Swiss-Prot record:
The keyword Transcription does not apply. It comes from Chlamydia pneumoniae (Chlamydophila pneumoniae). The gene is tig. Consists of 3 domains; the N-terminus binds the ribosome, the middle domain has PPIase activity, while the C-terminus has intrinsic chaperone activity on its own. This is Trigger factor. PANTHER family: TRIGGER FACTOR CHAPERONE AND PEPTIDYL-PROLYL CIS/TRANS ISOMERASE (PTHR30560), TRIGGER FACTOR-LIKE PROTEIN TIG, CHLOROPLASTIC (PTHR30560:SF3). The lineage of its organism: Bacteria, Pseudomonadati, Chlamydiota, Chlamydiia, Chlamydiales.
């Protein structure tokens, strides 16, 4: 149903369509249009030179009569800019961004009557007040107890620090490590070079780290062995830009892990094996606590996503679904090592999962920004700097470049703010849930 909002300078008529598509007519007052007209004339004056006048000093009426096309073009741009901003300041369906404008046109342009500008654009979702009273999280589970078996597994992992790694010529067997490179190429293009998906990646031939199908391909093979596969799935061919996968075994490595004793424990800054076990237990308990907190965080995300429904912008949703679908199909083909036939059977299920994941992710994106704003949450300078350092390490490694451009710095700031906005909003949801759980119902 059409709606109208206005102030002394602008009026905005809005009509909404599914998918957060909005049609708007912005009416610009004569006063605003005349002010913008003066700005346009001033700019044109600075760009031209007229005989008998110093640059920028020609009378307005002379400029308007001699350069009407230039003035009208400049004025049109200024009017469109002001009308666009009015969509947010006067209207209540803010565009996602300038790029979200599908079309715009000036339908009236008169210094006596004002201007009219029509827009079609994608807007931020309209989200109602959150019904916090309906927020519900599962009862929090205690962190996992650390068993003696966990300690032994931890010692085995520590033992890898002292392990002897020997390249062998014999065929690979259970427990070995293998170094693999994976390339993709086009079978029907002799001139095309292969592209690396990964190089010299290490895998352990074990049930814990490989799917059965993947492990089976690389048991009983030697260094230099190649596994060549043809991709028949059109989606995977499109994603990888090729139809042939070549796995090359660079090395088969036998690993011998010694038993950890007091001497080796002292090399790890522990007083004895018992002291190392005690320190390991503390570390594993911290990891278990972190895992518990992450699970609770995920439960809060799930609860928030279910708290309220609203329409999502069509283009953002389609883009996110496409991205997640790609990730899921590639993961199934290259990591879980599904055959093309198995992938075809699972494809509809994976696409459905991608649609659900994309919908949830976008809902949480908009909901967390709403919570951050509504609840007046804040980000300290120290928090922002810490998160910028995290983002920088993820992007550049431990040694970021000395000279970072302003654009790159701005990207790091935005990434850090987005992460902190999201995490602080979810933490607020957790506090709300705890408060509701501790408040007796009437």
């Amino acid at each position: 149903m059409p709606r109208s909002l206005s102030n002394e300078q602008f009026s905005v008529d809005l009509e909404e369509s599914p998918g957060c598509i909005v049609s708007a007519l912005v009416k610009v007052s004569p006063e605003v249009l005349n002010k913008l007209n003066k700005q346009a004339l001033k700019k044109i004056k600075k760009e031209i030179t007229l005989p008998g006048f110093r640059k920028g000093k020609a009378p307005d009426d002379v400029i308007a009569s001699r350069y009407p096309t230039n003035v009208r073009k400049e004025l049109g741009e200024l009017v469109t800019q002001d009308a666009y901003h009015a969509l947010s300041t006067v209207g209540d369906r803010r565009p996602l961004s300038p790029k979200a404008v599908r079309s715009n046109s000036i339908t009236q342009f008169d210094l006596q009557e004002g201007a009219k500008v029509e827009f079609s654009y994608e807007a931020f979702p309209a989200i109602s007040d959150l019904p916090w009273e309906n927020l519900s999280l599962p009862q929090e589970e205690a962190a996992s107890e650390i068993s003696d078996s966990d300690i032994e597994k931890g010692l085995t992992n520590i033992g890898m620090f002292f392990a002897t790694k020997t390249p062998v010529e014999r065929p690979s067997q259970e427990g070995d490590f293998i170094s693999i490179s994976l390339h993709v190429s086009k079978s029907n293009d002799e001139n095309a070079s292969s592209a690396a998906i990964f190089e010299n990646k290490y895998f352990k031939l074990s049930e814990e780290e490989m799917t059965d199908a993947f492990k089976e391909k690389f048991l009983g093979i030697s260094t230099g062995h190649r596994v060549v596969e043809t991709i028949t799935s059109p989606e995977i061919q499109s994603f990888l830009r090729g139809d042939t996968l070549t796995f090359t075994v660079n090395a088969v490595i036998e690993v011998s892990i010694p038993e950890i004793d007091d001497e080796k424990a002292r090399q790890l800054q522990a007083e004895s094996l018992d002291d190392l076990k005690a320190k390991l237990r503390i570390q594993l308990e911290k990891q278990a606590k972190d895992k518990q907190l992450q699970k609770r965080f995920s439960e809060a995300e799930d609860a928030l996503a279910m708290l309220v429904d609203f329409e999502l912008p069509t283009s953002l949703l389609e883009e996110r679904i496409s991205l997640i679908t790609r990730e899921k199909l590639l993961n199934a083909r290259l990591i879980q090592y599904c055959s093309d036939e198995e992938l075809e059977k699972r494809k509809s299920e994976l696409i459905k999962e991608a649609e659900e994941d994309a919908t949830k992710a976008l809902k949480l994106l908009f909901l967390t920004h709403k919570i951050f704003s509504d609840e007046k949450l804040t980000i300290s300078r120290e928090e922002l700097q810490y998160m910028m350092d995290v983002c920088s390490r993820e992007r550049f490694g431990q040694q970021p470049p000395k000279d970072i451009s302003n654009d790159t710095l701005q990207e790091l700031v935005m990434s850090a703010r987005d992460r902190l906005t999201y995490s602080k909003a979810i933490e607020h949801v957790l506090r709300k849930a705890e408060l509701l759980a501790s408040t007796p119902s009437a």
